[in-house]
């Protein structure tokens, strides 16, 4: 058992009274939660419970689509990212996201990393080479691709492609890393590599992962939040959530009685 407690952690994200609407239908209901800095927080729950919606609020990706609205407060470093004046470019530089299916750009491995950086910073050639290497090392991919950086990224295996997407995201040096079912399309060996990588990434980043795989949440995360029908039912350290949950709904889900 660990001795983790949200009360003793430094807060990275504070969620207050968050509600979310699709076409005027409420899908998140008065969410209050704290995301601690440089820890891994897993969000679990049955399909349609709102966990991916919550994740997408953290970088406001929903703003790309019509008739979607978030209300309440999401404080990143004490600033409300939902405020009208909060810059989207600033938010995207602070909060990176990796999706369920790896989507490498149809270009070289090197350009997959440098392309994203060029849109945010002006670096010399040497600085860019160093940044690309750092990102690939950070995603545990460098040793596998260092001799074929000019080859197409689409030729990588599924697991390598997902690590490339992680490298592309961390190359921008965000503060928060969002992972939406990052291993659901991968084989067990690739999944194991990604899980090991996730545990290493928390040394530099605050990590939030949405997963249907409860074993993955138990293995990787420091804290776990259980959601059901748009509500946050329980949130605490992972050991407690999985062994001594305080809510019956949480216990029923974890023990397989529904979901």
UniProtKB/Swiss-Prot annotation:
It comes from the Bacteria. One of its GO terms (biological process) is phosphate ion transmembrane transport. ATP binds at residues 45-52. It is an enzyme of class 7 (translocase). One of its GO terms (cellular component) is plasma membrane. GO terms for molecular function: ATP binding; ATP hydrolysis activity; ATPase-coupled phosphate ion transmembrane transporter activity. Part of the ABC transporter complex PstSACB involved in phosphate import. Responsible for energy coupling to the transport system. Belongs to the ABC transporter superfamily. Phosphate importer (TC 3.A.1.7) family. This is Phosphate import ATP-binding protein PstB 1. It comes from Pseudomonas syringae pv. tomato (strain ATCC BAA-871 / DC3000). The lineage of its organism: Bacteria, Pseudomonadati, Pseudomonadota, Gammaproteobacteria, Pseudomonadales. The gene is pstB1.
């Amino acid at each position: 058992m660990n001795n983790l407690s949200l009360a003793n952690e430094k807060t990275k994200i504070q969620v207050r009274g968050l509600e979310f609407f699709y076409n005027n239908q409420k899908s998140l209901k008065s969410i209050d939660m704290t995301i601690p800095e440089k820890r891994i927080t897993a969000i679990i729950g049955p399909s349609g419970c709102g966990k991916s919606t919550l994740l997408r609020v953290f970088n406001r990706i929903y703003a790309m689509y019509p008739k979607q609205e978030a209300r309440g407060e999401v404080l990143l470093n004490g600033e409300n990212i939902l405020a009208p004046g909060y810059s989207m470019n600033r938010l995207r530089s602070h909060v990176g996201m990796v999706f369920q299916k790896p989507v490498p750009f149809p270009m070289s491995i090197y350009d997959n990393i440098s392309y994203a950086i060029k849109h945010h910073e002006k670096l010399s050639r040497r600085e860019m080479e160093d940044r690309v290497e750092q990102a690939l090392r950070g995603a545990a991919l460098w040793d596998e691709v260092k001799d074929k950086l000019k080859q197409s990224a689409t030729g990588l295996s599924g697991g390598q492609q997902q690590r490339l997407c992680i490298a592309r995201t961390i190359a921008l040096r965000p503060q928060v890393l969002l992972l939406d079912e990052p291993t659901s399309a991968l084989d067990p060996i690739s999944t194991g590599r990604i899980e090991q990588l996730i545990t290493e990434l928390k040394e530099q980043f605050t990590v939030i992962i949405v997963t249907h795989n409860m074993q993955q949440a138990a293995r990787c995360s420091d804290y776990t939040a259980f959601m059901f029908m748009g509500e946050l039912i329980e949130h605490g350290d992972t050991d407690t959530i999985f062994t001594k949950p305080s809510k019956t709904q949480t216990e029923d889900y974890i023990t397989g009685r529904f979901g």
